[in-house]
């Protein structure tokens, strides 16, 4: 009798496998980091083969730690860093180039050329997204144009494209020996190639971006049985696939219209459930697919994507050597009462929502001799909260409904200083659930629903519990004064790259 569901959570900096029981509790977790490759300023790559190796290692590790027998696992789900682009040879399984990561800005010129006819919102009515370096379509075009011989192979059906979900599921189900080449609607909605109404690849956009349809995966529901695993999970159904932010929405049980969550990881991503129709944004948000369970109707979302939040803490740790462990930032930040009047705008990959300015670059403004490392650490945490406020304001305008509380998850939600400042600068309560790693949980839920381990989404609501709630403690005058300073600081980053 199957008692558990497994999930592979492949993120920007690490891969983990988590095993959950029927109540959504974590039974075991194993996690490993992978190499970040920076060939040029603005370029970010990963080695797809390293990611596949790490995936196999963490599956083995989680099984070993849990003591769970393979026969006790009902299904395995996959969730992934979205938009990151892999192209590989069908016959050998060998990538033709490193994975181009979502943060990578090398496709700036491709996006600018595409925008010359119709502007940045040229494809938005069909795909819900602005032309930006963030999304997969231009990354595929770059690989086809810049890696010798690949375009010819693509046109002959000899190479395959996938985001990380597709790459992992293809390998997990056999790879060159019959691996399944699929993606789900949530990941496909981030390529800039899928029509939100038809839930199919859009031939007009494929023609404009010069992407052969033959290399694209089949688009499937987020909860469905795609194939059977090989290796450590031999014979287990691979049955759930969600982009990481949609998985977090699902794991937070935001199944009703108007429910929202914010995930704090490498970047920050706020998603609002808008129901069964795509809602166009007038305020710099993305219209995207939330999830699709089997043959049930598709659920759509508005999303505010912030490129750099946790990655700013990593930068202070790795590049400036401010501390040895990311968790230490809270201690330094708490050594001062405020940021000393400075703001850090971490536009390392340009600015995402609500600005969509790929030519912005990072800045620290307001520096004086008074400023110490502690002030910089505090300003780094505050930058995450300010960016979230900008997205929440946009979401309130688009939806016409003011959010009354924010569910949060991800690694940074254990930083109490950040969470309190977040509640202060939003003016609404911030709520952390008992299982904060909701991304993996969402993928597990999707896989479990596909095989009947859970019967329906309402069964999952009972698993959600509140761990902690932060209430606003800042007066409104201070809140607006600080936020006004942030808005001024952001303008200093615009148009930095010619």
Curated annotation (Swiss-Prot):
Residues engaged in binding ADP? 12, 16, 266, 310, 411, 415
Chemical reaction(s) catalysed: glycerol + ATP = sn-glycerol 3-phosphate + ADP + H(+)
Q: What is its EC number?
A: 2.7.1.30
A biological process (GO) of this protein is: glycerol-3-phosphate metabolic process
Pathway where it operates = Polyol metabolism; glycerol degradation via glycerol kinase pathway; sn-glycerol 3-phosphate from glycerol: step 1/1
Query: If you read the UniProt record, what top EC class would you report for this enzyme, in one word?
Result: transferase
Role, per record: Key enzyme in the regulation of glycerol uptake and metabolism. Catalyzes the phosphorylation of glycerol to yield sn-glycerol 3-phosphate.
Q: Which family does it belong to?
A: Belongs to the FGGY kinase family.
> Could you tell me what this protein is called?
Glycerol kinase
Tell me the organism: Roseiflexus sp. (strain RS-1)
